[in-house]
Amino acid sequence: MAEIRPFHGVHFNKALVEDLAAVICPPYDIITPEMQKELYRRSDYNFVRLEFGLETAHDMDTDNRYTRASKMLRQWLEQDILLRDDKPAVYLHDQHFTHKWKKCRRRGITVLVRLEEWSKMVVRPHEGTLTKPRSDRLNLLWALQANTSPILALFEDRKIAPLLETQAKGEPMLEAKSVKGESHRVWAITEPEAINRIQNSLSHQPIYIADGHHRYE
């Protein structure tokens, strides 16, 4: 059912951006105005500048948060602040955090997913969407020609759990700890056999969007 593919990920260059904790940001829809300003102060390369840039009183069609983000993305790529991986990969992501005084781990994979109409029930929603946030994310997508944040989806398949566990024993390509104490580790899975196993595990089932309905639409 769900068709997934590896892709060439873009990420911060650790040789030029040593403190990854200073450049990561939360999802756009939970960033308050105060948090936005703090993230700007934290680093000239904080990702909020692309994901949810500041608006100004002088914004216009040719100079606004979307055009500024587009210009900045091009600059970061030209300056090697951001690097594009040579090989397509499935990216394994482990997040460790504390919730209600309990230590938790969230494990996921970041992949490309073929867009499907809701009526096909391949990708399934659980909530409606609003025009304003949908328009905001679409404007950013058009300006950058890139996705700045993933759509969080759920699926159940215990068959690939051992494969992901094996991959997680290797050295992560990226590792960071947020100011709130959450730790993140990312591995790039590039072996064709491993990628095929992951693709096959999802080929017979739907996936359920947990967060990101506006961006999917």
Identify the residue ranges that each predicted region occupies:
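A cross-family signal for N-terminal binding/gating loops and helix N-caps
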Residues: 1-217
